[in-house]
UniProtKB/Swiss-Prot annotation:
UniProt function note: F(1)F(0) ATP synthase produces ATP from ADP in the presence of a proton or sodium gradient. F-type ATPases consist of two structural domains, F(1) containing the extramembraneous catalytic core and F(0) containing the membrane proton channel, linked together by a central stalk and a peripheral stalk. During catalysis, ATP synthesis in the catalytic domain of F(1) is coupled via a rotary mechanism of the central stalk subunits to proton translocation. Component of the F(0) channel, it forms part of the peripheral stalk, linking F(1) to F(0).
Listed Pfam families: ATP-synt_B
Principal localisation: plastid
Protein name in the entry: ATP synthase subunit b, chloroplastic
MF annotations from Gene Ontology: proton-transporting ATP synthase activity, rotational mechanism
InterPro entries tied to this protein: ATP_synth_b/b'su_bac/chlpt
Chain ranges passing through the membrane: 26-44
Bilayer topology annotation: Single-pass membrane protein
HAMAP family the UniProt entry points to: ATP_synth_b_bprime
Annotated compartments: Plastid, Chloroplast thylakoid membrane
Subunit structure: F-type ATPases have 2 components, F(1) - the catalytic core - and F(0) - the membrane proton channel. F(1) has five subunits: alpha(3), beta(3), gamma(1), delta(1), epsilon(1). F(0) has four main subunits: a(1), b(1), b'(1) and c(10-14). The alpha and beta chains form an alternating ring which encloses part of the gamma chain. F(1) is attached to F(0) by a central stalk formed by the gamma and epsilon chains, while a peripheral stalk is formed by the delta, b and b' chains.
UniProt KW keywords: ATP synthesis, CF(0), Chloroplast, Hydrogen ion transport, Ion transport, Membrane, Plastid, Thylakoid, Transmembrane, Transmembrane helix, Transport
Note: In plastids the F-type ATPase is also known as CF(1)CF(0).
Amino acid sequence: MNFIPISLIFSGHGFGFNTNIFETNVINLAVVIGVVVSFVGDAVRELLKNRKETIVNNLREADNRALEAQEKLSQAKAQLADAQKKATEIREQGLVAAEQEKKLCIKQAEEDAARLKQVQQDTIRFQQQKAIQQISQQIVSLALQQVRQKLKMGASAPFHVSVNKSKIDLFKRSL
């Protein structure tokens, strides 16, 4: 083997100590980075790749959720529009029904008023007829009494009885 003399090594050439610290640090840093990149680089790349895939998947899921939320919002808006339309229809039907009910109530009230007026007229007529009949009976009774009195004064008893009977029969027939 060939040995390098020690004097050559310590003379600044060869395997001696390098007294320039900056160059040494740069070389050491390059070696460390090279070792780190060669050994740890694959793991870091794999970690970054996995993180990238996770982020991409999260973004896709977020987009899907956003689309679903948009669809649900559209459905909710459609349902709201339908509900408002139905509410308007129900309100209109209620107004129509209320108007019909109002007309029906007015008609029934008018019919009831007409019926009450008719009953009132009938009652008045009945009471008038009853009063007329009572007055007629009283007039007839008074007339009969006066006739009896006149006949008693101017006629005999049998004649008086026969005239009274005939007059009473005539009066009864006329009623």
